[in-house]
Amino acid sequence: MLNSKNYLALGLMSGTSADGIDLAILITDGRSKIKLGPSDYHPFSKSFKNRIKSVFKEEVNIKNLKKKKRIVEIENEFTHLNFLAINKFLKKNKIKKDKIDVIGFHGQTISHNPSKGYSWQIGNSKKLANLLNINVVSNFRNNDIINGGQGAPLTPIFHYYLTKKIKKKVCFINLGGISNITYFDHKSKTNLNNILAFDAGPCCSLIDDWVTQNSNKKFDNFGLLARKGNVKDKIVKDFLKKPFFTKLPPKSLDRSSFSIKKLRKLKIKDGAATLNYFVADTLLIAINCLPDIPDVCILSGGGRHNKFLVELINKKIEKYKILLSENYNWNGDSIEAYAFAYLSVRKLLNLPITFSKTTGVKTPLTGGQIFTFI
């Protein structure tokens, strides 16, 4: 008989935009039962965000002692910020620590390079577990990469069960720092091995970087800046010449794979417009890789707040029905935090989180490492 226990899990996510921590409570059996609880967001200060970004692209086997020390300092601060955010979140929602079965702690990605055999997330899981007296699951990507997978995306299994009641062919699009797509057919009895998922291209990370480097803003609110700009088609075409876009899925992307240097001579509004058009084009390319036309495309992630980008996506893929996650009463800012809460429970149950058509592994694999508190 299957273990039908329901677990109360807390998920923590800091994405490639590196703007803060998403927190979410989930009640689940680690399989098809999913109940979304409260969620919240804890922003990073501008100075800490800049410190994190300063160590992006670093190789996992750094030999420079000064750089090593700096990353350890940033990791300790990052871990402490997660600890503070959790305490504030639990107090606000009147949740006692001893009621939480497990924490799914993604950490902050510094570098993702599956071709070299690693994906590096900072965050001291053992320290966090001991501070909170709650077991923590992290290092979700390593087992997949060791076994020949891309280590990303990891959220498709959660997307699949979250949308189980939508008896349609579904395309779930996460507009995060990097955009990714999950496709499955709930009309038929889809085997988990038939879930298709892959990274589509850069998204909010590039747009936010451009805006923060050229203004005192953290992001282009609602895409108002981009809306005023003129797209530079040649730059968009140059971006799209990257081999990544002709590579067949499954595939994954590091935030540092693309640079905004091509835009440096542009006005801020024109650069923003150009990047938005580029992102929309990458999604069109990605959706054309799907085995069938989806009945509905569901947008989640921070990019869905960019009304200009959403309009462009609608124009590019106008033959598809596009809805926001809020149409289903899901907070689109918290989907990935919910997902890592879910994945942590699957680790406790030794259930797989990656599959041949999501990351390229030969057989379904479990993922994550359990850090027990002392």
Task: List the predicted regions and their residue ranges.
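A contiguous, well-structured pocket-lining segment that forms one wall/lid of small-molecule binding clefts
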Residues: 216-296, 307-320
